[in-house]
């Protein structure tokens, strides 16, 4: 059974996450894909790997996804990246980071490089999709 936590960001915004706290050790930070959540096999597999290998772990559901508050349609890469930055600063702190991003989560991982470049010791992109908007949505946007 996985114990989920919530970080209250504002009176109306909370972010659901899983953590395995370890001091002075690298953290795996798993970031899920578009319209996904923490209920799947990947977050659990990486959490179990972290526990077996004496590593810290953090995974979160971006606002509007999973059981985090908010509406999905109000989210975007920038907002979800900010959710991620906030949780990393709160949970991982100054520990080293190994990012694992699944699909869109790889894109959000890459966005974190500018904030945590001195802490990053690894990055794994699984089915990375940094250009998925072009095929799915770009042609539907207005010229404005």
Question: For each of these PLM feature ranges, what is it?
Answer:
Residues 43, 47-69:
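Conserved alpha/beta-hydrolase
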